[in-house]
Design a protein with these regions (language model features):
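Membrane-anchoring/interfacial helices and their immediately flanking loops
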Residues: 1-44
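Hydrophobic core of alpha-helical transmembrane segments in multi-pass integral membrane proteins
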Residues: 7-20, 97-106, 288-299
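Polar-ligand-bearing catalytic/cofactor-coordination segments
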Residues: 18, 22-35, 90, 94, ...
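Transmembrane alpha-helices and immediately adjacent membrane-cytoplasm interface residues
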Residues: 48-62, 72-121
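Interfacial/capping segments of alpha-helical transmembrane domains
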Residues: 57-70, 304-315
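Hydrophobic alpha-helical transmembrane segments and immediately flanking/interface helices
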Residues: 71-85, 160-178, 314
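Pan-zinc metallopeptidase signature
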Residues: 264-315
Length: 315
């Protein structure tokens, strides 16, 4: 089996299996950073494996076989059996179709990311123009009755809080919520979410992208919760999340404190996992990340090693 075939098999396998296994490992939210890393490892290696496979198919159709295919050439020379024109034509058709699909997906992904960037930058600029500053509140305040607090990437970034949220939160709760939003911006969570959501929009039938985008959004909220708890009491953050829960969606591209997986987050804030569960979950996620990183390399190495052994024997 060629390296391209191994990578193609890897991409298909991970795209099918990861959406079934990773949610089980990340459901508890015990180690959200590792959960995000596992999803990113699955998504990134799947995309890279698919791209390399397509490039390899195109290269084979355009420039012919490389030296690592010496075994097949040897068999053909000995047996007198060569590739039929029909097989060569089929390879060319597959290469053209794969290349066209990859190009189309790349263009759509780029357009989606550019559109998301325009929307968030425009909203950040508009919020700074329309909103106002209040002493003691490290955010732009909008005069709106809805309870909302969110961050928007831009130049510069903006943290937005509504008058309704100010009325619903006391000062310690507000500080904890704003620390949560700053954690999102410091960790570049909005940009990461834009990429995974753009992938999901580009290929909505590929479950690793759609399931990954939803779970990464949930886990990033937990990451921001953990960061905020380093400087604020967990109960203050918990009360702030509950006060903002169910207030409605935030603008496109924004990341809000009380809009994603509030019940799951409230549960982990109120009842943290014990040490044994933390160690177990981290070990499971660490093993998953290592496996996702090692498998494509191992598949490629085995495929190349098998052919190189044959080449060595021939020489």
């Amino acid at each position: 089996m060629s390296a391209a075939a191994c990578l193609a098999a890897y991409a298909v396998t991970v795209a099918v299996v990861a959406p079934r296994i990773l949610p089980r490992l990340t459901r508890s939210g015990i180690a959200p950073r590792l959960g995000v890393a596992a999803w990113l490892a699955a998504i990134t290696t799947t995309v890279l494996a698919a791209v390399v496979t397509v490039v390899a198919v195109i290269a084979e159709a355009v420039v012919g076989r490389s030296i690592v295919d010496a075994c097949e050439h040897l068999v053909q020379a000995v047996s007198g059996v060569h590739s039929a024109p029909a097989a060569q034509f089929a390879t060319t058709v597959v290469a053209l179709a794969a290349g066209g699909t990859l190009t189309f997906a790349g263009v759509q992904l780029t357009r989606n990311l550019a559109a998301r960037r325009r929307v968030t930058f425009h909203h950040a600029r508009s919020a700074r123009m329309v909103g106002r500053r209040i002493a003691g509140v490290d955010a732009v305040v909008l005069d709106a009755p809805e309870r909302a607090a969110y961050c928007v990437p831009g130049r510069p970034h903006a943290i937005v809080v509504t008058r309704g949220a100010l009325d619903a939160l006391d000062h310690p709760q507000l500080d904890a919520v704003l620390a949560h939003e700053r954690a999102h911006l410091d960790g570049r969570h909005p940009q990461l979410l834009a990429v995974v959501r753009a992938l999901a929009d580009t290929a909505p039938r590929v479950s690793i992208f759609t399931a990954g985008a939803a779970d990464v959004a949930r886990l990033l909220e937990m990451c921001a919760d953990d960061q905020a708890m380093r400087t604020h009491e967990p109960r203050m953050l918990l009360h702030g999340l509950v006060a903002l829960a169910g207030a409605g969606p935030v603008p496109d591209g924004a990341v809000g404190a009380g809009n994603v997986a509030v019940l799951d987050r409230a549960g982990r804030l109120a009842s943290p996992a014990d040490r044994a569960d933390r160690l177990r979950n981290r070990a499971q996620l660490g093993a998953a990340i290592a496996l996702l990183a090692a498998l494509p390399l191992a598949a490629t190495a085995l495929a190349l090693a098998g052919r190189m052994l044959c080449i060595t024997a021939v020489l």
